[in-house]
Amino acid sequence: LDASTYTVSAADGSDKFVLAFNCTNAKLKDKRVRQAIRYAINHKEIIASRGNVDYALGGPIPSVDPGYEDLTGLYPYNVDKAKELMKEAGYTTDKPLRLTLTYANTYGTELGDQLKSQLAKIGIDLKIDYVEFSTWLQNVHANGDYELSLVDHAESHDFYKWTTPDYYYHYDNKNVQALYAKALAATDEADSAKYLKQAAKAVSEDAPRSE
């Protein structure tokens, strides 16, 4: 390429690797379990294994969308805290919680292997179910039949998914829905972003997923 004609640049995008928790699943209704999983995930280790081309979000809104805030500080990597929460919920490494992670084999096996290893440290026996993407679309996305799921959501401005209980997350939080409604109704962009930021933080604190 002629450097005087073409310029190559890199920028943030809207892609979000989402580890989703089925909020209607009996095992995952316990917020302590969801929080423990958040604390137990070593994002730096996972990102390093992928060539350090990604970064942790900590929340449901990417940096290119209105309402973004770095929420990684809500659940920093803390195995001891994760173990404490799991013990409160009735699980230990000697009495593990068994969960299944379902995700498309197009993403390879490394992510699943890393999560299995990391969660084993806090008393979670994670089974990995690698499926064809078409199977994931039918079983997880369409039917909501899963416990944990991992997928790259590339859509921008898609916070509405966290306000739609019928979406495969099965997440139902009236406060989040009310804040999102205020964001949509706001006539000022700054006000809209403020409500989105509040809603995103509420979602992240509730721990129905990890990014």
Where do the protein language model's features map onto the residues?
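Extracytoplasmic/secreted proteins, especially bacterial periplasmic and envelope-associated proteins
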Residues: 32-36, 41, 45, 77, ...
